[in-house]
């Protein structure tokens, strides 16, 4: 038996890649300096994996932005609008991810979507009629050669052709099958070149195999792989899956002439059952036994019990998915040993994989004994009062009265807003000064009084600016908040916060998910102080801004000793208390963000309701079920696909929902119309994830497109997400255009 991992975090132990890349974006360093820093980081990471005793080390799991974008770039899947720009390869690569606005042209970024059921986001490639699939990049070869210079023969990793097609968009008139032959040729060229460089095995990531597969999709996969594997160019091929089991394709997959198959024994409900039914003796099984998504220590006895049931002769122990979904290392944390011992970040998971391998081979007695002792000790007690409150919930606690249609009429009269009301999603740019003041306050270098004065000044400035520009519903800007989940978690019992537990979310953006350690209750009012203050500074309505229970759960590292449903209900009651306090303080519009609602949606449709939506949607309703009819409840969602769960979203019974739509060309609106969606909607009219400012007329055209599909009385005008990470000049310029476009559109309604 040997050991490996599917992939390793990219940003660095202290987010070195993020800070270096952002310097490049600000033109403070050259492309050569960026590439040199990245090379140094890769060497450091390979060395860590090697020193931990992992026998197979992956390469090309590193990315300057996103691994799906890397694959698209490698195979020349680049839209003609970007191909035509006179840019360097690196500039073109970043133009796909971030858009480009300069003397050489003006192009929007490609869309961004959630990577399966994680909080990682990938850039969505687009296959056009003009797309000429061919081997065009060299990153995968460069990184293999780099590692070889360090004495390491790595296993190169690339997104497999089936998943590349499944996660991409296609221009009208072309389909995935049109690109099969060209992709086969291009991938085989990669095989040949890697074999020439001295590679022995390539990892083709095919997580799309764990989803429900139609007969057409299965046929596409088999057509691709039969052609691809007809000539492997002397390279061994590992088809690596993760995030679930491959029940729909297993029988065909094991018959293909692949050399190895990677299966997920953590999230794959049926994986063990499938392999117990038979696994070919001539293939190697890469067994994903250590959870790549959560930060809790592996229970060695449970993992060993699973491994003992696997009939395969050749097994490589690995992570259940890439370790990019967990923080780098616990070494920089300051928790008490009694707490820290329960956590394993990426580096520690290398130890776990190595330990399990050693125990399987007759060693590791000390590691096994320590692990048994850890799991034999009670970790945390229960909150009896909270458990009783949950046990006492009835159907009435999940139902808001009167019904939506009656509330809508009441709210229109009470709020008296113009048609196409304008607002933003919540946060305004957090400048260096804002972050520095927060840090100084946290360190005790700034008094509470001085910090409060600074925050009040920020709120005053932006409330005044919103009034001057002409916004109808204002926000206070969230200057007191570091992260939309961490800020709430810091005011809830049962939460722990890492010092350096950063995880890549999209591009160079990292998030630091809090850890749910025990039962969750609200310690004190969280947002009332600043929401009330902001409302006191204006006669216009100011939205109270909360993060919803499902998003707080999904953007935290959840407990594994109770169900995520039970954890979510605990959080829902805490947020419910906050909603009622905001209402009592005179806040008439309360936004409860559920940005991550879709994130934990099972990958198989048959599991959607029973395993998730049947409790996630009621948990949201529990939060707002007892507010008055004239209190308007908003929610917001971003980065996701919703067209297939629209009835469930309507069932959240919010009064208004805003969502990311600009990058996806407002496709969701057709489905809203088809499904007779009742909730008022604010489709994002411009993309905030790119620094470009919408052109004059751009937002006008977007509003026109929205009004062609949604009745004007149901439409709100807003950006597609919060503005925390954007710069002030681009933010103000974009928002002025948004308000001007909304006012112009109102004239056409009359």
Curated annotation (Swiss-Prot):
GO terms for biological process: methionine biosynthetic process; methylation. Pfam families: Meth_synt_1, Meth_synt_2. Keywords: Amino-acid biosynthesis, Metal-binding, Methionine biosynthesis, Methyltransferase, Repeat, Transferase, Zinc. 5-methyltetrahydropteroyltri-L-glutamate binds at residues 15-18, 114, 555, 599. Its EC number is 2.1.1.14. L-methionine binds at residues 425-427, 478, 593. Its cofactor is Zn(2+). InterPro entries: Cbl-indep_Met_Synth_N, Cobalamin-indep_Met_synthase, Met_Synth_C/arc, UROD/MetE-like_sf. It catalyses: 5-methyltetrahydropteroyltri-L-glutamate + L-homocysteine = tetrahydropteroyltri-L-glutamate + L-methionine. L-homocysteine binds at residues 425-427, 478, 593. The keyword Phosphoprotein does not apply. Belongs to the vitamin-B12 independent methionine synthase family. Catalyzes the transfer of a methyl group from 5-methyltetrahydrofolate to homocysteine resulting in methionine formation. This is 5-methyltetrahydropteroyltriglutamate--homocysteine methyltransferase. The gene is metE.
């Amino acid at each position: 038996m040997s050991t490996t991992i599917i992939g390793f975090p990219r940003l660095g132990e202290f987010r070195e890649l993020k800070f270096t890349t952002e310097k490049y974006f600000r033109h403070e360093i050259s492309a050569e300096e960026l590439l040199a820093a990245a090379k140094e980081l890769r060497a450091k990471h390979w060395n860590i994996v090697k020193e931990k005793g992992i026998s197979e080390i992956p390469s090309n799991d590193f990315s300057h932005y996103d691994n799906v974008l890397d694959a698209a770039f490698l195979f020349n899947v680049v839209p003609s609008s970007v191909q035509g720009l006179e840019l360097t390869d690196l500039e073109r690569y970043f133009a796909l991810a971030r858009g480009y606005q300069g003397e050489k042209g003006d192009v929007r970024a490609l869309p961004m979507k959630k990577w399966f059921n994680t909080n990682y986001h990938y850039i969505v490639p687009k296959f056009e009629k003009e797309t000429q699939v061919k081997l065009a990049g060299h990153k995968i070869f460069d990184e293999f050669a780099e590692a070889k210079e360090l004495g390491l023969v790595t296993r190169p990793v690339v997104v497999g052709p089936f998943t590349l097609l499944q996660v991409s968009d296609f221009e009208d008139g072309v389909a995935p099958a049109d690109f099969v032959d060209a992709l086969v040729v291009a991938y085989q060229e990669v095989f040949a070149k890697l074999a020439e460089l001295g590679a022995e095995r390539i990892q083709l990531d095919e997580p799309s195999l764990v989803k429900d597969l139609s007969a057409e999709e299965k046929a596409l996969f088999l057509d691709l792989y039969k052609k691809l594997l007809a000539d492997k160019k002397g390279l061994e091929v590992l088809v690596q899956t993760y995030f679930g089991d491959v029940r729909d394709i297993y029988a065909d997959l094991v018959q293909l002439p692949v050399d190895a198959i990677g299966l997920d024994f953590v999230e794959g409900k049926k994986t063990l059952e499938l392999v117990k039914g038979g696994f070919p003796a001539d293939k190697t099984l890469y067994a994903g036994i250590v959870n790549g998504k959560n930060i809790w220590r592996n229970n060695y006895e449970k993992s060993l019990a699973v491994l003992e049931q696997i009939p395969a002769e050749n097994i490589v122990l690995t992570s259940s998915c890439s370790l990019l979904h967990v923080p780098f290392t616990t070494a920089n944390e300051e928790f008490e040993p009694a707490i820290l011992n329960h956590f394993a970040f990426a580096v520690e998971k290398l130890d776990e994989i190595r330990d399990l391998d050693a125990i399987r081979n007759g060693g590791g007695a000390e590691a096994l004994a320590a692990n048994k002792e850890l799991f034999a000790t009670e970790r945390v007690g229960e909150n009896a009062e909270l458990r009783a409150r949950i046990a006492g919930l009835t159907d009435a606690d999940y139902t808001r009265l009167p019904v939506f249609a009656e509330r809508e009429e009441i709210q229109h009269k009470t709020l008296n807003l113009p048609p196409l009301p304008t607002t933003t999603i919540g946060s305004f740019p957090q400048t260096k000064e804002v972050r520095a003041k927060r840090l100084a306050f946290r360190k005790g270098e700034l008094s509470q009084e001085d910090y409060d004065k600074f925050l009040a000044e920020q709120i005053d400035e932006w409330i005044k600016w919103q009034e001057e520009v002409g916004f109808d519903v204002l926000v206070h800007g969230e200057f007191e908040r570091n992260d939309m989940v961490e800020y709430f978690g810091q005011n809830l019992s049962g939460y722990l916060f890492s010092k350096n537990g950063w995880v890549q979310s999209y591009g160079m953006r990292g998030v630091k998910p809090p850890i749910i350690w025990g039962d969750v209750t609200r310690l004190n009012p969280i947002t009332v102080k600043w929401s009330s203050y902001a409302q006191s500074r204006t006669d216009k309505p100011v939205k109270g801004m909360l993060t919803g229970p499902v998003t707080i759960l999904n953007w935290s590292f959840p407990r594994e000793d109770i169900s995520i449903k039970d954890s979510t209900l605990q959080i829902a009651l805490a947020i419910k208390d906050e909603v009622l306090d905001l209402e009592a303080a005179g806040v008439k519009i309360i936004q409860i963000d559920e940005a991550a609602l879709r994130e934990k949606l099972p990958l198989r449709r048959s599991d959607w309701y029973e395993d998730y939506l049947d409790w996630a949607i009621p948990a949201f309703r529990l939060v707002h079920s007892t507010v008055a009819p004239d209190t308007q409840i908003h929610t917001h969602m971003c980065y996701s696909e919703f067209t297939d769960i629209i009835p469930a979203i309507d069932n959240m019974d919010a009064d208004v929902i805003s969502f990311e739509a600009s990058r996806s060309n407002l496709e969701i609106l057709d489905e809203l119309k088809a499904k007779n969606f009742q909730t008022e909607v604010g489709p994002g009219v411009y993309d905030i994830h790119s620094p470009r400012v919408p052109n004059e007329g751009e937002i006008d055209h977007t509003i026109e497109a929205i009004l062609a599909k949604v009745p004007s009385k149901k439409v709100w005008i807003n950006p597609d997400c919060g503005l925390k990470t954007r710069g002030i000049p681009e933010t103000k310029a974009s928002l002025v255009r948004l308000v001007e476009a909304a006012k112009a559109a109102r004239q056409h309604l009359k």
